[in-house]
Structure formats: structure tokens, C-alpha cells
A protein has these predicted regions:
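Conserved glycine-rich cofactor-binding loop
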Residues: 23-25
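The beta1-alpha1 cofactor-binding region of Rossmann-like NAD(H)/NADP(H)-dependent oxidoreductases
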Residues: 48-49, 71-82, 114
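Active-site helix of classical SDR
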Residues: 132, 168
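Substrate-binding pocket helix/loop in short-chain dehydrogenase/reductase
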Residues: 108-109, 116-121
Length: 247
């Protein structure tokens, strides 16, 4: 795992990195790799205790990095607006935005709870859509920035019991692809990240062999590397699957 952070030198020094859903899973892994390279982090999670524990642990490991955090539930439009206002007041500019806030609730379309689709859309789609819209004017003004939208293999392939979750991830991928086309004239990059199964806290207590699926750090390494390319290069899609294929 130590070699995970030994990636080529940064093209940009001390970038401002915004990561939602940063207290665990992919968001935590992405926060860690940027912290390891000394970038400035602005992170968010709905769980205040887990969020500030993440800040404490990252600062202990990487004392030279700067981290600011704000606990907000981005499934709520008013809290998205509050988080965006805080970001614009605290970050001189935003170099990388990682829209990672999300939630997974399994269930078939027929049998899932009433309101499941609305909940998945608010968390997995609207949070990214609304936050991006609020931050884009400052990015467009600078003609610079990179937006990562954390989609899923479920954005590409339907599967039994995917239900509202898969629908929301298909929608997020559509948002990301449209955003990519709209922002080309402004030199703002957009990357859709579509990972398969990776071992995170959501798998703890399950019978899955961690070696059967990916590590969260694999996804973080790809995101970080994509953000380090020359200004004239944009990775549009990052698709990662376990070596043995999907579960």
C-alpha cells in the first residue's frame, strides 16, 4: 500500500480539492491521496463525527496539508447551497471538485420502499447537479478546473435489485456526459468515474473475500492520476472492475 502514493510529480502545486462524502469509502481514499501530496482539502460529509475523525487522522499522517471540513447533508438543497457558499468564502479558487456523496439501497423496482427513487435521486444525482451549478461560475471565470463525478458500473449495466440506485447512477452518468460537452469551451475537464465492487466499510461484516474485489485506493489512484495530466488532455471515463470481473 505504501507504493500507492508514489505517483508522478504534480503539474499543479497546492491545488484546492473539494470532496463530498469524504468521511469513508472512495471519498476518504481520494482525500488521503491528495493530502499525501500536500494539496489543500475542503471536505464534506453528513456524519459530523466521522468527518472530523477523518480530518484528525489525515492531519496526523500529513501535518503539512491544510484541511477544512463542514458537515452537511447534500441530499438537501438548502444544505448544498450553504456548503457552496462556505466553499466560495474559504477557497480562493477550486481546482478539483469530486462529487462523491451518495448512498446505496438495494431493492427491485417493484418491491423497494415508496420514496426510494426520490431518496436516491436527491443523494446521488441532485447533490452533484446542484453543487456543480453553484461552483461553476467561479471555474468558468478562471477557465480552469476539473470535475469528477463518481458514477458506477451500475451507470452502465442494469442488474437484478439495482432498482432506484441503478436508475440514479444512470442519471448521474448522463449529467456527467452532458456537462463534459458543455464545459469544453471553458477548458474545464469533466471525468466520469465508473468503479465496480471495491472493498469499503459497506462490505464489512460480509462474507466477501477482500482479494476478490478492488481496493478503494485503486479508484483514488486513478482519480489523482487523471487530475495530473496536461491541460490539453482529459480522461472522460474511468472504468475499473475487479480482475475476475463483476460480482
Amino acid at each position: 500500500m505504501e507504493n500507492f502514493y508514489n505517483i508522478s510529480p504534480d503539474y499543479n502545486t497546492f491545488m484546492n480539492i473539494v470532496i463530498t462524502g469524504a468521511s469513508k469509502g472512495f471519498g476518504r481514499a481520494i482525500a488521503e491521496i491528495y493530502a499525501a501530496h500536500g494539496h489543500h482539502l475542503f471536505i464534506c460529509s453528513r456524519n459530523e463525527i466521522a468527518l472530523y475523525k477523518t480530518v484528525e487522522e489525515l492531519l496526523t499522517r500529513y501535518p503539512d496539508t491544510k484541511i477544512k471540513a463542514k458537515a452537511r447533508d447534500l441530499s438537501r438543497k438548502e444544505e448544498v447551497a450553504d456548503f457552496a457558499e462556505w466553499l466560495l468564502a474559504n477557497a480562493y479558487h477550486i481546482d478539483v471538485l469530486v462529487n462523491n456523496a451518495g448512498r446505496f439501497i438495494p431493492g427491485s423496482i417493484l418491491n423497494e420502499a415508496d420514496g426510494a427513487l426520490e431518496e436516491m435521486l436527491h443523494t446521488n444525482l441532485y447533490s452533484a447537479y446542484q453543487l456543480t451549478r453553484l461552483l461553476l461560475p467561479s471555474m468558468i471565470k478562471r477557465k480552469s478546473g476539473h470535475i469528477f463525478n463518481m458514477c458506477s458500473i451500475a451507470s452502465l449495466n442494469a442488474y437484478p435489485n439495482g432498482g432506484a440506485y441503478s436508475i440514479s447512477k444512470f442519471a448521474l452518468y448522463g449529467f456527467s456526459k452532458n456537462l463534459r460537452e458543455e464545459l469544453k469551451p471553458y477548458q474545464i475537464k469533466v471525468t466520469s468515474v465508473l468503479p465496480g465492487a471495491a472493498y469499503t466499510d459497506s462490505w464489512s461484516g460480509s462474507n466477501i473475500d477482500p482479494k476478490r474485489i478492488m481496493e478503494a485506493g485503486d479508484i483514488a489512484a486513478m482519480v489523482y492520476t487523471a487530475s495530473q495530466l496536461s491541460p490539453q488532455a482529459c480522461v472522460e471515463d474511468i472504468i475499473l472492475r475487479p480482475q475476475l470481473g463483476d460480482l
